[in-house]
């Protein structure tokens, strides 16, 4: 009988903890309007940020292409925008 009482107490405590956690989660999550505002403020929505990301990806891809075409270890370059032959990427 004592084991059943302890098991019931454990189940009650765990259930209460789960209930409190669920209620707190429901209180903290943003509403639909707040989600829309957060999405509008994301950095990817800014055209300057997008252009900068595209340029960075282009530089990385040019560096990888250059690294594949040469035996030089391009990872040790101080300036990745300049190729080994002195031209700009």
Swiss-Prot record:
It holds the Pfam family UQCC3. It is a single-pass membrane protein. The keyword Lyase does not apply. Residues 29-89 are mitochondrial intermembrane. It comes from the Eukaryota. The chain crosses the membrane at residues 8-28. It is found in: Mitochondrion inner membrane. The keyword Transmembrane applies. Keywords: ATP synthesis, Membrane, Mitochondrion, Mitochondrion inner membrane, Transmembrane, Transmembrane helix. Its main location: mitochondrion. Residues 1-7 are mitochondrial matrix. Residues 23-80 are annotated as: Mediates lipid-binding. One of its GO terms (cellular component) is mitochondrial inner membrane. One of its GO terms (molecular function) is phosphatidic acid binding. Probably cleaved by OMA1 under mitochondrial stress conditions. GO terms for biological process: ATP biosynthetic process; cristae formation; mitochondrial electron transport, ubiquinol to cytochrome c; mitochondrial respiratory chain complex III assembly. Associates with the ubiquinol-cytochrome c reductase complex (mitochondrial respiratory chain complex III(CIII) or cytochrome b-c1 complex). Interacts with UQCC1. Forms a complex, named COMC, composed of UQCC1, UQCC2; UQCC3 and UQCC4; mediates MT-CYB hemylation and association with the first nuclear-encoded complex III subunit UQCRQ. Belongs to the UQCC3 family. Required for the assembly of the ubiquinol-cytochrome c reductase complex (mitochondrial respiratory chain complex III or cytochrome b-c1 complex), mediating cytochrome b recruitment and probably stabilization within the complex. Thereby, plays an important role in ATP production by mitochondria. Cardiolipin-binding protein, it may also control the cardiolipin composition of mitochondria membranes and their morphology. This is Ubiquinol-cytochrome-c reductase complex assembly factor 3. The gene is Uqcc3.
């Amino acid at each position: 009988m004592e084991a059943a009482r302890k098991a019931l107490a454990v189940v009650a405590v765990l259930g209460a903890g789960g209930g409190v956690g669920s209620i707190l989660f429901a209180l903290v999550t943003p509403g639909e309007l707040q989600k829309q505002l957060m999405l509008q403020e994301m950095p990817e929505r800014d055209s300057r940020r997008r252009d900068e990301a595209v340029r960075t990806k282009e530089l990385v891809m040019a560096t990888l292409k250059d690294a594949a075409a040469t035996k030089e270890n391009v990872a040790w370059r101080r300036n990745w925008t300049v190729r080994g032959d002195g031209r700009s990427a």
